[in-house]
Design a protein with these regions (language model features):
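Aromatic "clamp/platform" in nucleotide-sugar-dependent glycosyltransferases that forms part
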Residues: 281
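Short hydrophobic beta-strand element within catalytic cores of glycosyltransferases
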Residues: 298-301
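Short alpha-helical donor nucleotide-sugar binding micro-motif in glycosyltransferases
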Residues: 154, 262-263, 269-273
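Acceptor-binding helix/loop patch of EC 2.4 sugar-transfer enzymes
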Residues: 56-67, 108-148
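Membrane-proximal helix-turn-helix segments that form the acceptor-binding/catalytic region
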Residues: 78-86, 99-101, 120, 135-159
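Nucleotide-activated donor-binding/catalytic signature segment of Leloir-type glycosyltransferases, i.e.
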Residues: 245-263
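Conserved donor-binding/catalytic core segment of Leloir-type glycosyltransferases
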Residues: 186-187, 192-225, 234
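Conserved acidic donor-binding segment of nucleotide-sugar-dependent glycosyltransferases
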Residues: 313-314, 318-325, 334-339
Length: 393
């Protein structure tokens, strides 16, 4: 079985490729990223480099790029891969950059699977519009042609890989039957030592990027409402909050909030925290939650964070609705006041993370890929005739 995977950057493609290899597939990845950036990728997996000047400029020169340019780059990358993709059995493409390659791969005998970590494009755009208003910035909708490309990918795919029920539930009911839930748990390091004792200054941490999706606004509102003595909030992000009036104004009022930039070892950041929070408005999975849990840090997450679906709220974490500063403040206050609860939840969190997989093992994800392959094997090919002979992969 020959499987082609296309992704502009590594993302979780090493986990996908490794899972496919475990199930007996021969895998080739097409990407604009060199192989050295694909950590822990099985040696048997081949990689075809499809250059992208824009991706290179973003990575090496840290050149700021507009959304319009990114949309155009995904189109160009997709058509570049379509020109070189080899005949095979299955093509798995990353959402928004796979439509042309899907057509080419299907003409050459492959079946198309879409990898979509984020919610349905219409759901996500509605959320972005609402959050733009809350943060005080103009809403910039995706161009119509880019939306249509994504809708066409959904329709064209035989199956869609999604990391959570949260993502799956945003799709139309008629489409949910072809979505396979594949939790992105599998890149979680377990430090030999942790720091379960409470710090002299009660420290809450959060990790994330895009302010429109990560719920920082509600966390800052909760933090300001609490006004806890001897407490500090650490925000690990590369985002520039000065571009968002709603965030900028709150940060000016809060002296006990620090923005943390590059951290050589993210485990060091987690172990500075007494509590970790993912206040996400939109997070298809959110692996940072389990990274913190592996460091024996009790966590609070919203139900719009896909990884929260693996928690038992009140035992190994606290799950709250998104966009609710009041409930977030209550959850933080309970862990601030009740040290026994905080310690018990921290221990249970690490145990849950260990039970789900250690040292890059990913049993939940591997099982989901097995389900995908079984579904394809049990469904007859209808979209394209198989080629008479396979060329060398």
């Amino acid at each position: 079985m020959h499987v082609a995977v296309s992704t502009t950057r590594p993302f979780h493609s090493p986990m996908l490729a490794n899972a496919l290899v475990k199930h007996g597939a021969r895998v080739r990845i097409y990407s604009s990223a060199p192989r050295r950036y694909f950590r822990r990728l099985d040696e048997s997996v081949r990689l075809t480099l499809v250059p992208s000047l824009l991706q290179a400029a973003m990575h090496f020169a840290h050149v700021p790029v507009s959304q319009k340019a990114l949309h155009a780059d995904s189109w160009l990358y997709d058509h570049s891969v379509a020109a070189v993709v080899r005949p095979g059995d299955i093509f798995i493409g990353w959402a928004s950059a796979s439509l042309a390659t899907a057509h080419a791969a299907k003409r050459r005998g492959a079946r198309f699977v879409l990898d979509r970590a984020c919610p349905h494009v219409d759901f996500q755009q509605q959320m972005v519009e609402q959050e733009s208003a809350a943060l005080g910035i103009p809403y910039q909708p995706q161009p119509a042609w880019f939306r249509e490309r994504q809708l066409a990918e959904y329709a064209e795919a035989e199956r869609i890989l999604a990391p959570s029920e949260y993502t799956r539930a945003t799709f139309p009911e008629a489409m949910r039957g072809k979505i396979i839930k594949a939790p992105l748990f599998g890149r979680c390091a377990f430090p030999a030592t942790t720091h379960p004792d409470r710090h002299a200054e009660f420290t809450v941490g959060v990790v994330g990027g895009e302010p429109l999706r990560k719920g920082y606004l509600y966390l800052l509102d909760a933090w300001e409402r609490l006004a806890l003595p001897d407490a500090r909030l650490l925000i690990r992000t590369d985002a520039d909050f000065t571009h968002y009036p709603g965030l900028r104004e709150r940060l000016l009022r809060l002296s006990n909030v620090d923005i943390v930039r590059y951290v050589p070892d993210i485990n060091d950041f987690y172990q500075r925290c007494d509590v970790f929070v993912l206040p996400s408005v939109d997070d298809g999975f959110g692996m940072a939650l389990f990274e913190a849990m592996a460091n024996e840090v009790p966590c609070i997450a919203t139900s719009h964070c896909g990884s929260s679906e693996l928690l038992t709220s009140g035992r190994d974490g606290i799950v709250i609705p998104p966009r609710n500063a009041e409930l977030l403040a209550e959850a933080l206050l309970s862990l601030y006041r009740q040290e026994d609860l905080r310690r018990t939840m921290a221990s249970a969190a690490r145990a849950t993370a260990a039970a789900l997989g250690k040292d890059d093992s990913s049993p939940l994800y591997d099982a989901a890929i097995g389900t995908l392959l079984d579904c394809l094997a049990s469904t007859p090919v209808t979209a394209a005739k198989r080629p008479a002979a396979m060329t060398k992969y």
